[in-house]
Swiss-Prot record:
Cofactor(s) listed in the protein's UniProt record: Zn(2+)
GO annotation (BP), single: formaldehyde catabolic process
Binding site for Zn(2+) 2: 103, 106, 109, 117
Record flagged with keyword Oxidoreductase: yes
GO terms for MF: alcohol dehydrogenase (NAD+) activity; S-(hydroxymethyl)glutathione dehydrogenase (NAD+) activity; S-(hydroxymethyl)glutathione dehydrogenase (NADP+) activity; S-nitrosoglutathione reductase (NADH) activity; zinc ion binding
Pfam families xrefs: ADH_N, ADH_zinc_N
Gene3D superfamilies: Medium-chain alcohol dehydrogenases, catalytic domain (3.90.180.10), NAD(P)-binding Rossmann-like Domain (3.40.50.720)
Organism in which the protein naturally occurs: Aspergillus oryzae (strain ATCC 42149 / RIB 40)
Protein name, per record: S-(hydroxymethyl)glutathione dehydrogenase
Described purpose of this protein according to its UniProt entry: Oxidizes long-chain alcohols and, in the presence of glutathione, is able to oxidize formaldehyde. Also acts as a S-nitroso-glutathione reductase by catalyzing the NADH-dependent reduction of S-nitrosoglutathione, thereby regulating protein S-nitrosylation.
Enzymatic class: oxidoreductase
Keyword Oxidoreductase in record: yes
Amino acid sequence: MRHVLNKEQLLMVKQAAIAWAAAEPLSVENVEVAPPKAHEVRIKILHTGVCHTDAYTLSGKDPEGAFPVILGHEGAGIVESVGEGVTNVKVGDYVIALYTPECGECKFCRSGKTNLCGKIRATQGRGVMPDGTTRFKARGKDLLHFMGCSTFSEYTVVADISVVAVTPSCPTDRSCLLGCGITTGYGAATVTANITEGSNVAVFGAGCVGLSIVQGAVKKKAGKIIVVDINDGKEAWAYKFGATHFLNPARLRKTVQDELIDMTDGGCDYTFDCTGNVSVMRAALEACHKGWGESIVIGVAAAGQEITTRPFQLVTGRVWRGCAFGGVKGRSQLPGLVEDYLNGDLKIDEFITHRETLANINTAFEQMKQGDCIRCVVDMVVS
């Protein structure tokens, strides 16, 4: 029988990195973490990645960004306590937080056409739990949640549909990276695009997501895998993950789309944008083969940005589409990727270029701006 404690006994005071305002450094300080309510889970976060989406929101350019907030959405840890009605995880489970929940009941989940879930989208977008309140407080003020995860805290509270149990055999400094970047790219190639064998592929942007697409393209036995990046330092990384070619658009005498068309006998079968640059998105579409080429948009553009192309590009058979979390369903499919890693079929270790502690989390944001950083993992255990 589960021992039920009262709210005062369950209230925790722990360390977290708080974003009090846009474009300001995170402040590592004590926060109150309330107990989980019905259908909620409190997690002890052991490791978290730092993603460009966190930096985007912190910059103030995110139209849904609100402050004060605890950022972070790429985390793994151990279930510390559960609220009433939670059946999918239990205390002691090793878990990954999910910014794309999976309820299995809403029209999105039942459609079989998407990994998006609508059950808590409205409240998650406002930075609160499904009941409209928050579980964080500091300096006497409520703190907002971020993407339903808030992994920049020693302890966090998430909805039960926003967490998945995985094998404890996988270290959390690896499994955390499956909470966003690696899964987003790998899934874009293997699930959303479902690349066919022998296809020619171009990947725009060679960060964590782009390199994960390369990894997925290799898995699907693509033909030419062409990585496009303006940073020559990414060339070695591209080849490390299985690319067959590397292009720096700044060094070309023609447009990158024309170069890709020439390299692939009329255009790529699949292209992927991981940059968030709307001009690059257009180039990626126009590099697709007439009649069947697909371009998948993954990068998030700044607020107010719009994509454009000549309608004839679409009339003649090219397809523009997008995906979140690579089209992967978090609760039903993510554990399989953890097993793939443990079996040696999915690279994770190779993405980790930097490590930091919670106290130095702002350094991780600075490192992310450098061309040699693929992923920084933050150790969330405070001694």
